[in-house]
Amino acid sequence: MCGIVGYIGTEQAAPIILDGLSKLEYRGYDSAGMAIFDGEKINTRKAVGRLKVLENLTHGGENMKGTSGIGHTRWATHGAPSDINSHPHMNNAGTIAVVHNGIIENYIPLKKKMQDKGYQFISETDTEVLAHLLDYYYKGNPLEAITKV
């Protein structure tokens, strides 16, 4: 089952998110990832396998600087377990990161709509469509964009 952890504060986010994800390991998952905002851009790291793989990749979160972020453990429902299909998913500009728990039943027509508008998809997941929809609807007000999505 998927797990989601988020953090906004004054401490470095990545180690806190990794700790939070470790508390969800008992639920089962096939991959893990996180997105950390460093004040200028969003950096993501994703890995198939146990959380330890992501911890090693990020040196316990030490090489992902920033005080806000999201993390996710994934149990695949759309798309095979892979680094690309792991969450978080980004919009094409790399300015929006999304994690999601559940199934988007109508993601195929939504994906087609966004592809017709020029959005490029790299994963096989239903969640990636959310990042592109948020990008499409965002006009300066995040709550308005989320409501429209």
Protein language model regions, located:
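Conserved short alpha-helical segments that host acidic/polar catalytic motifs at enzyme active sites
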Residues: M1-V149
